[in-house]
């Protein structure tokens, strides 16, 4: 369904028979000015999400209590007897969580926090909206609070020196980095200061002048910093040594496409530092990167020059290539202790978090993690890759003549009072398309019938996207977007998701529908599809009814397509011969 062709269609004829939708009331003028005008004294970043999140949590707790409050079935929260303190969280941090509107851990948080509090590597694969971000932030902050700063220069403001305890969180894009920073800084003490400070290094943001406890970065930005002019590698060495906890948020994206080589390379560097530290402790001698000839500086420096565009690119510009984890950064001409010694004393913890983590095949993200971290603890959500029972599904087959009216009817349906819980604030509807052109076309259609909407796609500037996303969070309305808004972004209380064009793959489908029914709430997903998608939709619905992974439906479609292609090729070959 190529919606961008609608720009050249006689819209007036199609829309003449449709009732004009009443526009949403505009926000108060004072509030609008506050959103659009640059502030000289911006409010603390944690206040942006505190109110919507508190509303969402309260509503979910009420629903959970009405269902028995035992955490069973389709409940979001853990059992009533499970508290933050019972998971190993200190009273101080538990108080900060209560202050942020998080009175009780979710099922996923209750499952993963005790494991992350240990020294084990952990892989958290759980459905969207299950509380994964706080699932790793809470134990990281707990560890950082409990660790005493023993280094002599612990009061230094240089991010590469001082405390030997830094948590590193890697995210695929700028918006997700800033979101994680907001969520970390929302956990404050009695004075209103964050328990542990977090800062982002991504996009236009340079390296922080004041050392944070939690550094959130895109792989490209981090590599560019580590490989700046540093002849003795001291900056890189100090940073790698100080990082004790590493989180890979949206791990499935970070381990494929344009991010794969960058992330694997960072893992090599961190593991190499672990081996150096292990050898130093065994020998009792100081060993640095500058003392190891096997660490190949030149090739690393050349491949470290990455553009800022890489942070926003998800289309796989860097080709896949096999990587030997154990032998990274080792000269091919030497076989020293690092090449033959596979057992070494661990000094870092790795945590991988994802809402979609396919494991079928060695090249999938799940397959890569199984090989690289065979001893990691896996924590899986109850509805990973499966239908969320809190979702109301609506499936509508459309043609070129009915797709516009079906889209407008879907938008109208989500605006009904009986569909949207007004206690959760303004109505929020997300309309997904497959391309930027289609998003622009849908926006034009909605504007022509009097429905204000906000655009969010990759052709918009980073500043425009940030402003539009904040407006959507604060004021609600209709957000017309591509899959750039499908992953990672936490917008509380989205009541309705509309697929104006059906998703092309299982990952996109799961992330789209995961924008609603988050944090224990209910939600609606309306999927418009054409005859070309009919078999795929039938397979998806069957998988949901049988509580099977949705990804298999898309795999069957791909296998069927490949089979048809092979048959067509054989026929062409036979005709030519």
From Swiss-Prot:
GO terms for molecular function: ATP binding; ATP hydrolysis activity; mRNA binding; RNA helicase activity. Residues 407-568 form the Helicase C-terminal domain. Residues 288-317 are annotated as: Disordered. It comes from the Eukaryota. Residues 113-375 form the Helicase ATP-binding domain. Coiled coil: none annotated. A motif (DEAD box) lies at residues 249-252. Keywords: ATP-binding, Helicase, Hydrolase, Nucleotide-binding, RNA-binding. GO terms for cellular component: chloroplast. A motif (Q motif) lies at residues 82-110. Its EC number is 3.6.4.13. ATP binds at residues 126-133. SMART domains: DEXDc, HELICc. InterPro entries: DEAD/DEAH_box_helicase_dom (IPR011545), Helicase_ATP-bd (IPR014001), Helicase_C-like (IPR001650), P-loop_NTPase (IPR027417). It catalyses: ATP + H2O = ADP + phosphate + H(+). The Q motif is unique to and characteristic of the DEAD box family of RNA helicases and controls ATP binding and hydrolysis. Belongs to the DEAD box helicase family. This is DEAD-box ATP-dependent RNA helicase 22. It comes from Oryza sativa subsp. japonica.
